[in-house]
Design a protein with these regions (language model features):
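Adenine nucleotide-associated cytosolic modules
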Residues: 1-136
Length: 136
């Protein structure tokens, strides 16, 4: 996928467990390297459980915390970005549509007075209902 280098980008990732937890740091690193206006929003309503520690990107200190919150705060801080997350499951089309709506960047980035951001949706979910929602 080719995006113009001066267009703001918003990435919305559904799922912060086995797949999402491992790709999140790489997305933050990529956005940092691209050095363009960007947002990365991680969505997951699940909490870190002991069984997750073996195969997911969490530590014992994260137990009981929301997965999206942990990943967003950890890696946004590392790369000097704003932590954006939704500590809830995205379960209906209205909620997803609101998340992926392209926002204008007026005011926040004066170089982009009315530019619409490019939106990328990443489905890193572990259930069929959420996968189907991503394809609608």
């Amino acid at each position: 996928m080719k995006l113009p280098t001066d267009t703001p980008v918003k990435i919305v990732m559904l799922g912060a467990g086995g797949t999402g937890g491992h790709i999140a740091p790489h997305i933050y690193r990529l956005l940092y390297a691209l050095d363009r206006p960007s947002r990365f929003i991680i969505c997951d309503g699940d909490k870190v459980e002991f069984k997750n520690l073996v195969r997911q990107n969490f530590s014992p200190a994260d137990l009981g915390e929301n997965k999206a919150k942990i990943l967003a705060e950890r890696y946004a801080a590392v790369f000097g970005m704003e932590a954006e997350y939704l500590p809830a499951f995205v379960e209906d089309l209205d909620m997803l549509t609101t998340l992926i709506h392209a926002d204008g960047w007026a005011g926040e980035y004066s170089r982009y007075p009315t530019v619409r951001e490019q939106v990328i949706l990443i489905g890193a979910v572990d259930n069929d209902k959420s996968r189907q929602l991503c394809h609608k």
